[in-house]
Swiss-Prot record:
ATP binds at G264, V265, E266, D267, S268, G269, L270, V271. This is Schlafen-like protein 1. The gene is Slfnl1. Keywords: ATP-binding, Coiled coil, Nucleotide-binding. It comes from Mus musculus (Mouse). InterPro entries: Schlafen (IPR029684), Schlafen_AlbA_2_dom (IPR007421), Schlafen_AlbA_2_dom_sf (IPR038461). Residues 1-20, 141-199 are annotated as: Disordered. Residues 370-401 form a coiled coil. The lineage of its organism: Eukaryota, Metazoa, Chordata, Craniata, Vertebrata. Belongs to the Schlafen family. Subgroup I subfamily. Residues 154-173 have a biased composition (Pro residues). Pfam families: SLFN_AlbA_2. Transmembrane segments: none annotated.
Length: 410
């Protein structure tokens, strides 16, 4: 009787990757068809997404940045605090907490396949010789970790492929809890790493850093806004992910009201800085100029500014710490709406603090209609003002009394 109970419990930890026939037989008696008028299909709920086969050559912050950009391309925006990258000898994977309806998660596999065919997924994110795998298999995480780390020494050898009766799988309360525990842990780590006694008189006001052109490590610059984006930029960021972010954010800022990309600042707004020598500055300037020269319409040098702000730290380092600030100025008003595209022919927009794109043909057409509708509304408003002024002038002319003429005969 105990063996049957344990075998029933271990079946809950088996990998969800099985044949469709077997899966349907297991799910049919457990699932009940919801009522047609329930209307709960589109309600978002918190899920944990399992992303495997990540490139182990890159550091954890770089993988988190690339994975965040990839999920945005799949129309699934997440915050960096909701991504936890785990490195294993045989597999590097990530756990991502997302708030999305079930239908959106169910469509992720074919959307990922379409994105791979259209080359929208960054090749650097996936390990060499493997394909990116997205799944919602919380129960199979422990099983997959055992496969990656090898067989357990307590597992009795035998020809039977099934699980051992004496093998017990510990529960995973941290994965079943939908609360964003990674964000609170990250905030505690930030407060511990902040240098003591560090103060800064610098702050971001109207997209400019006031005070001296220097920042203190641990200073708080505020929160991200529609026109302000922060990137931590540690590890191989400048040589790998920075070029992709230049294309995305500069194109989005050009197609909106401008903005700034700050590298060396955490998402929480704390200044950390990046190790950047004079040679790295020259390489970064050449990289930015070469990318923006391929934009269409042409982006002139006065449309953006690239600066490196020194960061004062309590610890001494061989390479100076700096914050990279790439500012795109507000585009000048043109006779007709302009839509910028990158050197790779992609179009991005900035909406509600997130990047939308690359846009499809239909989305670009909708953008053009909205822009022309806005321009038409401005022209109609000007016509109304001019018409009102004309009526007021005509009314003033009517109210004037005619001059009386009198003749005097001498």
């Amino acid at each position: 009787m105990s063996l049957r109970k344990r075998s029933a419990q271990t079946q809950m930890w088996e990998s969800p990757v099985m044949s469709q026939g077997k899966q349907s037989l297991l799910e049919l008696p457990l699932k009940e068809s919801p009522p047609k008028d329930s209307g709960l299909k589109a309600v978002p709920s918190t899920h944990t997404l399992y992303v495997s086969h990540l490139n182990p050559q890159f550091s954890v912050p770089v993988l988190a940045c690339l994975l965040r950009d990839t999920l945005e391309r799949l129309e699934l925006p997440v915050a960096r605090g909701q991504i936890e990258v785990v490195r294993r000898p045989r597999n590097t994977y990530a756990l991502v907490q997302v708030a999305a309806p079930k239908a959106v998660l169910a469509s992720l596999p074919w959307r990922l396949q379409m994105a791979l065919e259209e080359q929208l997924i960054l090749k650097e994110l996936t390990a060499r010789g493997k394909e990116l795998v997205l799944s919602e298999a919380l129960e199979s995480l422990h099983h997959r970790e055992q496969e990656d780390s090898g067989p357990s020494p307590s597992h009795s050898p035998g020809p039977s492929p099934g699980p051992s009766p004496g093998l017990r799988h510990p529960p995973l309360p941290q994965l079943a809890d939908p609360s964003p525990i990674w964000g609170s842990a990250g905030r505690r780590q930030i407060s511990q790493n902040r240098p003591s006694g560090v103060r800064s008189d610098s702050a971001i006001v109207h997209h400019k850093i006031l005070g001296q052109e220097q920042l203190f490590q641990g200073a708080f610059l505020g929160s991200e806004t529609r026109n302000m984006e922060f990137k931590r930029g540690s590890g191989e960021y400048l040589s790998l992910a920075f070029k992709h972010h230049v294309r995305r954010y500069v194109c989005a800022f050009l197609n909106s009201e401008g903005g700034s990309l700050l590298v060396g600042v955490e998402d929480s707004g704390l200044v950390q800085g990046i190790h950047c020598s004079h040679r790295d500055e020259d390489r970064t300037r050449l990289l930015v100029d070469s990318i923006l020269q391929g934009f269409k319409p042409q982006v002139f040098p006065d449309a953006y500014t690239l600066t490196f702000i020194p960061v004062i730290s309590t610890t001494t380092t061989s390479t100076p710490l700096k914050v990279l600030r790439l500012t795109v100025h507000t585009p000048k008003a043109q006779g007709e709406p302009q839509l910028y595209e990158t050197d790779q022919g992609e179009v991005f927009l900035r909406r509600d603090g997130s990047i939308q794109g690359p846009l499809s043909v239909g989305a670009i057409q909708d953008w053009c209609r909205q822009k022309w509708a806005m321009e038409l509304g401005k022209l109609e408003e000007k016509v109304k003002v001019l018409t009102l002024e004309k009526e007021q002038l005509q009314q003033q002319l009517r109210q004037r009394q005619p001059l009386s003429c009198s003749c005097c005969v001498l």
